[in-house]
Design a protein with these regions (language model features):
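Rossmann-like dinucleotide-binding domain for NAD(H)/NADP(H)
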Residues: 24, 31-129
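Residue-level signal for pocket-adjacent positions within structured domains
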Residues: 7-8, 13, 77, 92
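Rossmann-like NAD(P)-binding element
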Residues: 1-12, 20, 29-32
Length: 129
């Protein structure tokens, strides 16, 4: 399920909750980065936890998405450490690329154009999972 990012979900996946998981668990996050404590995740990966991890979003990714950085050094410590693990893949916000998400973006874009023209408040796109 898609989990919204708020105070109740901040670091929902942490040392304590990871300890409850089987070592062979597969962890996938396509919701919000701050749901997973990256330091706890890295500690667990170092200890052999997780069969596989797929992160479309992660806390601290800020300047590492939507830009080709294939010819520069990774300066973000969390990104660099996450990429060390062969069982982990970073997908850089590709989960948004669904028909529903693109349709919601297109609808809100058109509504915003109309609202701007009429002097009304602008909205934002939200795709319900």
């Amino acid at each position: 399920p898609l989990i919204m990012g708020d105070n109740g979900t901040y670091h929902l996946i942490n040392d304590e909750t990871i300890a409850l998981m089987k070592d062979t668990v597969m962890l996938v996050n396509t919701s919000r980065g701050p749901i997973i404590d990256p330091e706890a995740l890295i500690r667990a990966l170092k200890q052999g936890k997780f069969h596989a991890v797929a992160l479309d979003v992660y806390e601290g990714e800020d300047n590492n998405v939507y830009t080709d950085k294939s010819d520069v050094a990774i300066t973000n410590d969390i990104t660099a450490r996450l990429q060390m693990f062969p069982q982990l893949v970073l997908t850089s916000h590709q989960a948004f690329f669904t028909r529903e998400a693109l349709q919601a973006i297109a609808v809100v874009t058109m509504e915003n154009a109309r609202n701007f023209n009429e002097g009304n408040e602008l909205g934002s796109a939200e795709c319900k999972a």
